Swiss-Prot record:
Any one of the GO CC terms: cytoplasm
Protein's recorded name: Probable porphobilinogen deaminase
Cofactor note: Binds 1 dipyrromethane group covalently.
Pfam families the UniProt entry points to: Porphobil_deam, Porphobil_deamC
Misc. remarks from the entry: The porphobilinogen subunits are added to the dipyrromethane group.
Cofactor: dipyrromethane
Keywords: Porphyrin biosynthesis, Transferase
Annotated SUPFAM superfamilies: Periplasmic binding protein-like II (SSF53850), Porphobilinogen deaminase (hydroxymethylbilane synthase), C-terminal domain (SSF54782)
Pathway in which the depicted protein is active: Porphyrin-containing compound metabolism; protoporphyrin-IX biosynthesis; coproporphyrinogen-III from 5-aminolevulinate: step 2/4
Source organism per UniProt: Pyrobaculum aerophilum (strain ATCC 51768 / DSM 7523 / JCM 9630 / CIP 104966 / NBRC 100827 / IM2)
Top-tier EC class: transferase
Catalysis performed (reactions): 4 porphobilinogen + H2O = hydroxymethylbilane + 4 NH4(+)
HAMAP family (alphabetical): Porphobil_deam
Amino acid sequence: MRLKVATRGSRLSLLQTEEFLAQIKAVEPRVDFEIKIVKTTGDLVQDKPLFQIGVKGIFEKEVNLAVLKGEADIAIHSLKDLPSEISPGLVLAGFSKRTLPYDAVVSAVGYDLESLPKGALVGTSSVRRAEFIKSLRPDVRIEPLRGNVDTRVQKILQGKYDAAVMAAAGILRLYGESPPVKLSLLRPELLPPPPGQGIVAAVVREGEGWLIDLLKKASDPRATVEALAEREFLKNVGAGCHVAVGGTAFSRNGYIEFIAGYAASGKRFVVKLFGEDPVEVGRRAAEEIKRVAASVR
């Protein structure tokens, strides 16, 4: 049995794809894979911050299109790149084991949020990261930083930025436990990660029952629960990449802790909720964030 798999061509995307395909192979050893590399809008447009590109799903649309057109059987994504609603005719069918969902202060010298010098140049093209950092350290300068993980790491090592705020998962997946830069993890109470960060997801065509069943069997149970909660949060909060909203779930022993936050105008607001039903917890977290956001406008 041979499956065609569509994915982006960055080193991180290919590593994530290999990891997830190994999960599938572990439950169905007879399956083989053929990789189809797809260029996305987000890969091609590198001279603008993400929120200025003005297109939804800039890292996923073209990859999913390959599946819709029958050029591939599975599309592999970072879950955080998937909008709340994916293209009609497709279904989100599987989730990898989760790497750390946290963001991190990334630098050559080991800065954490507190030790960044006044006036330090911090790189990020994420509105969420920028607004939360402004609320925590209004005395640092924030400038756009685009490119794949390797490119951003090199710009830090070259001294073009004092630090950057990046997903810890990407750096750990690329470089393992000995990256060329130093990471200071940011607790979600300080900077709530985006929904889905650290999880790799598989998208397939609707009606592919056997393939959906295979991906469900290969999925990590804990990541699946957390993904359900975070996707429900994303769907109900109604925030795109131009709004500083984050939310992440932690599933332990059948119980879910959900941390969500909103930042604007130099202020940040963080809520913490608990429950057993991932959909219900995600929906409640979204309602809390919408209430908070409405009160500060």
